[in-house]
């Protein structure tokens, strides 16, 4: 626009019609690095070099490797073996890099740069031969080596595919710290297809590959062969540690998605990065698997239209620098870099209650209804719940409240106003009082006398999942998101007991009656009213285009609360 205006001014148009008569000039002060981050001044970053083909669309190859290595706070170097014109739709063209250039790149990188780990992906015959020479020259000083044998891609794009397979086995796999083949790669390395119908088949493949490739450690990736235990599908990756004659099976959640492009490259790069950071091989593999499964589950939308196999989200855990800069205590450039204005959307909510909108939202309602109509509350109300189940609930709730207090303190630290901070501290204090009540109940009702008993309570799966959720939201989320995550706990107990208030037949003075009375107290009802007002306030200060995030957070909180009570019902 500036160029167009200047052009118009030079063509004889009146200057005042298009150009401002007075030019403004403002000076913006750039902040120094955040104080804590300066502790890492001249940080010695672990270095990882990727030797692989490129993916011009960024989903796989060296592009995926660079993203992955960077996401693991390592320094990425590259040696491109093949240039490709490709997207998740198809490969449009490919051009191998000449052997001389590959050799020059490796020489330059290894001569002038530190290199902790080398990771390989799709290799050409030339690249394998050059790498073999360099590994021999380096001797005992060679970096660790992670080989992702991208054999299907190599055989599909190159007439020398079979040569690549034999050369990998002969020339570089004996130097490798680990090979990470998928099941198709395994068959090509073995020289035969095999039936894979049970875990034992995969174990045998891993052990045979170790022998054939002369590489001690083999990770057989299970993404292409999801297992079914009769209840649900899951992904099974098998790590064979040859020196220890040991298998480690990693069982992960199966995600029904087509966005898996580049997952294999990413896993090998994640393992290489973890090794560069000094983790053991088994730790590095675990970290790589979880990173990739998270990247798949979270996903990303970057293609113009639906594709058969889309890319994964390599940067799901990476922070946006500008967002942190805008909230920095010393940020003074608000005139030059204004914050996005937020228009409240309460007037668009039917009935003017964000809380009521949430509990009736299609994403939330099934979880909310299951929560506030739970059998646990009904059994407490009529006094028929087994005492051991209620004791289990009290013990789990005790540990939950400890984390709840921690989260409230984090919430307070992110509160926008002093009034909000004070409310968060009051809630934390109420939770602390409830902790005291739980201690009393365990002593007086359940005869707990051991002073160390509370420290010995083990966290059940439902509690671990719930606390993990709240703590993660408190660390990564903003004030509004944390408050919404805590809201189901604040509101649900009162609503659940209110539904059975006319059916409370538990003996008066019993622990069940006392619990119901507490949830039905005027204090708790007042807290619910305050909670509804707070939710409306949050809606007014949260970007309307991101409202679905709050819906999802609240729905998940209701689901976790339901699971918490279910765990008590199922305790034996």
UniProtKB/Swiss-Prot annotation:
Gene Ontology biological process terms, A to Z: thiamine biosynthetic process
GO-annotated molecular function: hydroxymethylpyrimidine kinase activity; phosphomethylpyrimidine kinase activity; thiaminase activity
Signal peptide (from-to): 1-19
Localization per record: Secreted
SUPFAM superfamilies in the cross-refs: Heme oxygenase-like, Ribokinase-like
Induction pattern: By absence of thiamine.
Keywords associated with the record: Secreted, Signal
Cellular component aspect of the GO annotation: cytosol; extracellular region
InterPro entries per record: Haem_Oase-like_multi-hlx, HMP/HMP-P_kinase_dom, PM/HMP-P_kinase-1, Ribokinase-like, Thiaminase-2/PQQC, Thiaminase_II
Domain of life: Eukaryota
Biological role stated in the UniProt entry: Is not required for thiamine biosynthesis.
Family from the record: Belongs to the thiaminase-2 family.
Protein's name according to its UniProt entry: Thiamine biosynthesis protein THI22
